[in-house]
Design a protein with these regions (language model features):
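N-terminal subdomain of lithium-sensitive/metallo-dependent phosphomonoesterases centered on the IMPase/IPPase/PAP
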Residues: 1-95, 281, 285-294
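Residue-level signal for inorganic ion chemistry
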Residues: 27, 31, 55, 66, ...
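Generic detector of well-ordered alpha-helical packing
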Residues: 56, 79, 94-97, 128, ...
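DPxDG-like acidic metal-binding loop motif
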Residues: 64, 85-139
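Short strand-turn-strand beta-turns centered on an Asx-Gly dipeptide
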Residues: 117, 143-147
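An extended, acidic
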Residues: 152-294
Length: 294
């Protein structure tokens, strides 16, 4: 079970999870029909940052469904930003892994999290091309309706790590140090894979299919659901900003970087590499500011 929260009952948490599941299912049905078909693709912040017509359509579906089901809510989406206000805040990524989606690679998902008074209490990550739905509320975490939990792997050399690192933004922020860091991690861990969806990386750690995951360039809509999933089974999610870690469940998902592990374990190389890169990027003045959602 996840940590109890006085501001949200288990019944309300379960209701929010059910609302998210229904919205995710409708979006997933739309997206799976669009997957591997010709589509309009544009660039948001540069040649590496894609958005498709289906990101926008998926977000419109989710915004309409979530806010109509829970009128007392705000919506924070990757494509359209924040709208509305209320006790509940929905953090939504309509397609996490847009590059994969646009090229026909099946590793992408829809991610939805519900926060009550800033505490994330429910979430859904739907990966229709993989036929997987990850869901969490205050009573626990499931994969396709069956209970699941992370595994605890003590030694780095035995651990399997998935991430989105290094990307172009990591090279822009940290230069050659990012490549050196990638080499250190590859040597230290049993296996490191770059798969292109932070939300699915967290879901895989929560399910026990990977032992750690991390990203140095993220937003709340990418990680809010997955962070709760990891913690639900006793794993750790550490937000990271300017070399300082944060495990507070009300703020960790708002930090611009993170790592997560499948148990209460310490991976010294991972901590040293990530805190160093996070700290140095801030010193160099090249990191993006911490995201805010007014």
């Amino acid at each position: 079970m996840t940590e109890p929260y006085a501001g949200c009952s288990p019944q309300e948490s379960a209701h929010l999870r059910e609302v998210a599941e229904a919205a995710a299912a409708r979006s997933a049905a739309y997206l799976i029909d669009a997957f591997r078909t010709p589509m309009a693709v544009d660039h948001k912040g540069g040649p590496h940052d894609l958005v498709t017509e289906h990101d926008l359509a998926s977000e419109a579906i989710l915004r309409a469904d979530l806010t109509s089901a829970v009128p007392d809510s705000a919506f924070v989406g990757e494509e359209g930003g924040r709208s509305g206000q209320g006790r509940v805040t929905w953090y939504v990524d309509p397609i996490d892994g847009t590059v994969n989606f646009s090229h026909g690679l099946a590793y992408w998902c829809v991610s939805i999290a519900a926060a009550v008074d800033d505490v994330v209490v429910a979430g859904v990550i739907a990966a229709p091309a993989l036929a997987q739905v990850f869901a969490v509320d205050l009573d626990g975490f499931t994969v396709n309706g069956a209970s699941a939990q992370p595994r605890r792997v003590e030694r780095e050399v035995d651990a399997f790590v998935i991430s989105t690192f290094p990307r172009h933004v990591d090279l822009e922020r940290n230069g050659e140090a990012a490549l050196h860091a990638s080499g250190r991690l590859t040597r230290a861990f049993g296996s490191v894979r770059t798969l292109g969806s932070g939300a699915l990386g967290l879901a895989h750690v929560a399910a026990g299919w990977a032992d750690a995951t991390f990203d140095l360039h993220t937003n709340a809509w990418d990680v809010a659901a997955g962070a709760l999933m990891v913690r639900a089974g006793g794993g750790r999610y550490l937000g990271l900003r300017a070399g300082v870690t944060d495990e507070n469940p009300t703020t960790a998902h708002l930090r611009p970087a993170y790592w997560a592990t499948g148990g209460d374990v310490e991976y010294p190389t991972l901590r040293e590499v990530l805190t160093g890169l996070s700290r140095d990027a801030r010193v160099n003045g090249s990191a993006e500011p911490e995201p805010t959602y007014p």
